[in-house]
Amino acid sequence: MAFQDLLDQVGSLGRFQILQTAFFCICILIAYPHMLLENFTAAVPGHRCWVHILDNDTVSANGTEILSQETLLRISIPLDSNLRPEKCRRFIHPQWQFLDLNGTFPNMSEPDTEPCVDGWVYDRSSFSSTIVTEWDLVCESQSLISVAQSLFMVAQLLGGLIFGHISDRFGRKIIFRCCLLLFAISGTCAAIAPTFPVYCSLRFLGGICLMNIITNAVSTMSEWTGPKSIALMTGIILNSCNIGQILMGGLGFVIQDWRTLQLTMSIPLFILFLFSRSVLESAQWLIITNQLDEALKELRRAAHINGKKDTGETLTIEFVKSTMKQELDEGQTNVSLFDLLRPPKLRVRIFYLSFVRFAATIPFLGLMLNLQHFGSNIFLFQIIFGAVTFIVRCAVLLTMNHVGRRISQMVSSFLVGIPILVNIFLSQEMQTLRVALATLGIGATTAIFTTHTVHHNELVPTVLRSIAIGLNAMFSRLGATLAPLLMILTVYSPDLPWIIYGVSSILAGLVVLLLPETRNQPLPNTIQDVENNRRDSRKTKQEDISMKVTQF
C-alpha cells in the first residue's frame, strides 16, 4: 500500500512504536483486570442465617454459653442434602431435642423453618468485604450478581457499536482518551457507590469504555506498524491483558476489602489519562480522512522519535498527496455500518470473521464458568490462568509468522473443541486430567483471540476498521451472553452444552479457512482495496511510488 512507503521513511518499527506500545500496554494492564474484578469484589463467601441464640451476645451470655458453637448451630440451622448447614433457612424455634443424640423421634414432624429474616453471618476468612456481604446478595438475591455481570457484558457490546463508529469519524486518539477518563471516573465512583443499583450503573458505564480502550490501542498500533511486525505489536498489547490477570490475582489476595480493591485498580487510570496526551494519532487514518496537515505533523513526530529527523523534514503535503492520491479520492465520503456490509467481498469477510469470533467466545466462557468449580483457591487459580495465557500468546506470535493466520486459528480451534468433547467421556474422579484438558482449552482460546485480532485488522480497510472491530466485538459479547444460557440445556442432557461448546469451536476452525491469508501483506486502506484484491496492482503501484520518491 502507498502508506507503507510513507511508514518506511519514518520508521515502521522503531523507538516510537516501542514507546507507544509500552504505554498502551500499561493502560490495558490496569484496565483489563476490571473485567475480572467481580471474581473478587462479588465473591460469594460461606454464609448462614443470623441466629438469635448464636449471634446475639446478650442471649449467648444468658445460659447458652456452656454449649459449643457447633451445638448451637445444630439446633438452629437445618442441614441440606449434603448434611451441611443450610445457607438460606433456619428453624423458627431452637430444636432442643436434637441435643439428645441417642433419642429417636419417629412421630416427630419436620421442624418448621423460615428464611433468614434477620440477615446473614458471613465467613470473612478470605474476604473481609464484598458487594455480596455489603448488600446481602445471597439466597433469593444471589441472581442479582449475574445481573451485574450481564450488564457489564451488554455494556461492552453497546460500547463497541457506538464508539466503533465514532472512532472512525473522529479518530482513535480522542476516543481512547475519552474512554480512559470515563473508565477512571466510573471505576472510582463504583468504589464509593452507596447502593447496588448505583454500583451496577457505574459498572455499565465502565463496560462501555473498556473494550474501546483495548480496540483503539490495537487499531492505532496496527496502523503505525509495518506488515511484518503487526502480529508482534498486537500480541504484545494483548499479552498485557494476561499480565493484568496475574496482577489481579495478587492484589485480590492482598486487598480483601472490595472498595479498596476497586479504588486501587481505578486511581492509576487518572495518571495514565494525563500521559495519554503524548499519544500520536494514526497518521493513516488522518490521511484517509483528508486531515493532511495533522497527518504530516504526526509523521514528522514519529520520524523524529525514531531518529530519522532529516527524513521527516523532507516530507511535504504535496508528497503525501501524490503518494496516496487514490486513497484520498476514495476516502472522502463519510462511512457507516452499511458501507461495511454493502460491498460483496467485504460483506463475506465480515460474516466469516463475526462467526469465528462468536463461535470462539462461546466455549471460552463455558470453560471459564466450569473452571471456577475446580479451584478452591481462586487467587492462585487466577495467577496460574494468567500465566498460562501469557505463555500461549507468546507462542502463537511465532506460529502466526511462520504458518500464517488461518492455520494458527484452525489448529487452536481444534485444540479447544477436541479437549471439551474428550472431557465428556471422562469420569468426575479423573479431576486432574479434566482440569488439564480444560486449561489446554483456555490456552487455545487465547491463541484464537490473539490470531483473530491480527487477522481481522489485516482484512478490513482503514476507513472502516473501528466500525468493523465494534461489530466483531458485538458478536463476541453475544457469544458471551449465550454461553451461560446454554447450561440450561443440562435439564435434557448434562453433556449437551459441552457438545455445543466443542462443536462450535471446531466449526470456527473450519470457517476460518474460507478467509484469505494475510501474513506479510500490507493493510488495506479503502473498500476498493478489498473488493479488487489488487495484489498485482499493488506491486505496480509500489514501483510507481518508488520512481516518484527518486524524482522527489
Curated annotation (Swiss-Prot):
GO MF annotation: an example: transmembrane transporter activity
GO term, biological process aspect, one: monoatomic ion transport
Domain of life: Eukaryota
Keyword Transport appears in the UniProt entry: yes
Composition bias, Basic and acidic residues: 531-546
Record-linked CDD domains: MFS_OAT
Transmembrane segments: 16-36, 144-164, 178-198, 204-224, 235-255, 267-287, 350-370, 378-398, 407-427, 435-455, 469-489, 496-516
Keyword Transmembrane helix tagged: yes
Family according to the record: Belongs to the major facilitator (TC 2.A.1) superfamily. Organic cation transporter (TC 2.A.1.19) family.
Alphabetical list of PANTHER family matching this protein: SOLUTE CARRIER FAMILY 22 MEMBER (PTHR24064)
Name of this chain's protein: Steroid transmembrane transporter SLC22A24
UniProt gene name: SLC22A24
